[in-house]
Amino acid sequence: MPVSAYVLIRTEADKTKGAFESLAKLKGVKTAHTVTGPFDIILLVEAKTLHELGDVILSKIRGVEGISRTMTCVTVETG
């Protein structure tokens, strides 16, 4: 069963646009939004397994230039 998570991302000053463009293209990213509030970008990420989801977040998302912090919220129920 696929797993999904919302990843809330804070970027460095003046890096939001570039980070957003890079993140939106990553495999597994289903939706990407720039937002107001304490975070700058929110992603919906899907993967086949929890392990694969972790790899996407740790290796790909956190590797994008300009990201200063992430918070991941794994979904437990979808309706």
Describe the role of every protein-language-model region.
Residues M1-G79:
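A compositional/biophysical signature of low hydrophobicity enriched in polar/charged and small residues
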